[in-house]
Each structure stands twice: as structure tokens, then as C-alpha cells.
């Protein structure tokens, strides 16, 4: 049975209390100032097969004071306490990262929309670049059986509770491909808590920090609700 520890705290002081290489794998999604110079788009546009454009409502999220790129000290501590790392948005932090042969490309299958086609993750692994396909555009989300195909039953869609929320299926894929049985995982920016659900289902121990009380409580509730459904 997995052990999930969620902490409502600033991750930097927390990491300073951790031992060297205490965690086998860090899977993190640090902020990179997405709301600093622009407002979040209120509607998501998806191009349909017939060529028409479909506008779907997206959740609106307030800009938070903590939404800033982490310092060098953050990355120094992250590398100290973990043996391997997967860092989402690594393309925004290149000045803090070494060259890597193994980037992860998440194809969100939303070509023709106003959103980014892909998101990138830097990794410390010595393998080739890998791509994962899972639709993620407003109300258009991939199905559990085939991430490239839109889920027909909208009741099965994940509720958006965070502006940079990523699907649980993506974290399951990461754990399946990059974590080993018995690995201890750390996430410094829990956000929506998707990683907690994936670790719970796959049996990985997780330690996670979330500085924002609103998101921490929402992610904690999401995990509790998920456990009831399992």
C-alpha cells in the first residue's frame, strides 16, 4: 500500500530538511510565470474534423503571487535530494539545467486550437526523447483507453481545479516508464494533485508540497474522493 504525504508548505525550506538522495525520483511542475504578463484565456477553441471551430468554456483561475520562476537554489536542492528528475516546463529553465538526451514531449492532440500543441519535460535519464499523446483542451479530454481519442462521456472528464493541471493518465505513463517498484517520489508543486492519484493507484510512496492553501485543500479532497471510488 502506498504512503502519500501532502504538505501545505513552501517547498524550498522543506527540501532543506531532507537528506541527500532521499528520494528516488522527483516529478515536478514548477511555476514559470504563465499569468505574469497575460490573462488566462476564457475560452478554448478546437478545430473539428469538418473544419469548423468549436469554442468551449475553460475554467478561469486567479493569478497567484507565487507564480514566478524558481531560483537557482530551488534546483540545487532538488538535485541534492533526488536521484533522478523529471521537470515539466524544462524549456523555461534551461539556464538551471544540464544538457539532456531524454526530453519528454506531451502531445496534447489539440492542433488547430489557440493552446500549445505540446508541453516539454527535461529529465536526468540517459535514454532517447519520448512522446506521449493525450488530448487535453478545455472540455476535450482523451479517453482512458486511447488518449488520442476524445472521451465521449463528459462525466468521465477530470474536473479542472488548477491552471496548469495535467491528466492523471500522463503521470501514470511517467511512473510506468521511469519509476521502479519501491521508488520514493517527490513533487515540489502538487497543484491539482494528479500525481497523487497516479501514485495511489500504482502503489508508489509520494511526498508532495503545495504552498497555496486553496489548491492544497482541493488536491487533498480530490485524493480522498479518489480513494473512496477505488
Each model region followed by its residue ranges:
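Class I S-adenosyl-L-methionine
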Residues: 17-28, 32-64, 79-230
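Active-site donor-binding segments of glycosyltransferases and PAPS-dependent sulfotransferases
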Residues: 66-78
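Extreme N-terminal starter segment of soluble prokaryotic enzymes
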Residues: 2-6
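Conserved SAM/SAH-binding loop
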Residues: 8-13
Amino acid at each position: 500500500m502506498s504512503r502519500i504525504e501532502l504538505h501545505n508548505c513552501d517547498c524550498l525550506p522543506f527540501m532543506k530538511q531532507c537528506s541527500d538522495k532521499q528520494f528516488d525520483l522527483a516529478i515536478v511542475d514548477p511555476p514559470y510565470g504563465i499569468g505574469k504578463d497575460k490573462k488566462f484565456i476564457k475560452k478554448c477553441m478546437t478545430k473539428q474534423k469538418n473544419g469548423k471551430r468549436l469554442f468551449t468554456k475553460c475554467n478561469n483561475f486567479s493569478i497567484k503571487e507565487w507564480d514566478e520562476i524558481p531560483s537557482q537554489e530551488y534546483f540545487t536542492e532538488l538535485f541534492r535530494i533526488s536521484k533522478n528528475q523529471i521537470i515539466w516546463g524544462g524549456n523555461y529553465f534551461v539556464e538551471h539545467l544540464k544538457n539532456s538526451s531524454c526530453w519528454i514531449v506531451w502531445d496534447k492532440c489539440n492542433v488547430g486550437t489557440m493552446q500549445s500543441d505540446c508541453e516539454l519535460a527535461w529529465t536526468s535519464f540517459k535514454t532517447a526523447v519520448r512522446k506521449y499523446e493525450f488530448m487535453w483542451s478545455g472540455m476535450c479530454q482523451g479517453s482512458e483507453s486511447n488518449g488520442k481519442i476524445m472521451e465521449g462521456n463528459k462525466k468521465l472528464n477530470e474536473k479542472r481545479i488548477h491552471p496548469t493541471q495535467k491528466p492523471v493518465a500522463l503521470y501514470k505513463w511517467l511512473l510506468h516508464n521511469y519509476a521502479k517498484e519501491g521508488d520514493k517520489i517527490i513533487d515540489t508543486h502538487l497543484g491539482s494533485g494528479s500525481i497523487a492519484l497516479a501514485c495511489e493507484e500504482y502503489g508508489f510512496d509520494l511526498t508532495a508540497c503545495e504552498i497555496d492553501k486553496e489548491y492544497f485543500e482541493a488536491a487533498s479532497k480530490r485524493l480522498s474522493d479518489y480513494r473512496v471510488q477505488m
